């Protein structure tokens, strides 16, 4: 009976450890707009990446149009964002310089109209189109 209890306890501890580290590995994360992958948005996949990773992480983005304003912060590095097809995998956003800022009603200006802002090091984009539409 004690052996069974010990075995069951060890098994449960292993499950909890694996659940806590689901995204903490060098594997590929998958993004798909149609819900057939772990994530529907690229930003959600970026959010689960660890700060100051020493390993390479790939975020594979399936074909589709992703209307997102992405920021890859300075504490993220070694990330490759790879599209399924460069002509059919699109990150887009529609800011422009004349949009009024909340609170002061001044124009946004061009420096705030990015679609993707990369502050981290060793960030690679492959086989994907980024546009500011």
Give, region by region, the residue ranges found by the protein language model.
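Right-handed parallel beta-helix/beta-spiral solenoid domain characteristic of secreted/periplasmic
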Residues: 33-35, 77-133
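Glycine-rich, low-complexity intrinsically disordered segments
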Residues: 28, 53-56, 129
């Amino acid at each position: 009976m004690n052996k069974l209890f010990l075995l069951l306890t060890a098994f449960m501890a292993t499950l909890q450890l694996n659940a806590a580290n689901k995204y903490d590995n060098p594997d590929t994360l998958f993004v798909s707009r149609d819900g057939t992958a772990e994530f529907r948005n690229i930003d959600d996949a970026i959010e689960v990446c660890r700060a100051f990773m020493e390993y390479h992480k790939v975020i594979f983005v399936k074909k589709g149009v992703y209307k997102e304003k992405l920021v890859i912060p300075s504490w993220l590095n070694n990330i490759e964002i790879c599209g399924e097809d460069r002509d059919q995998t699109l990150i887009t956003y529609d800011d422009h310089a004349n949009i009024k800022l909340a609170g002061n009603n001044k124009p946004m200006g061009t420096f705030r109209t990015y679609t993707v802002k990369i502050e981290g090091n060793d960030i690679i984009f492959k086989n994907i189109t980024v546009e500011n539409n």
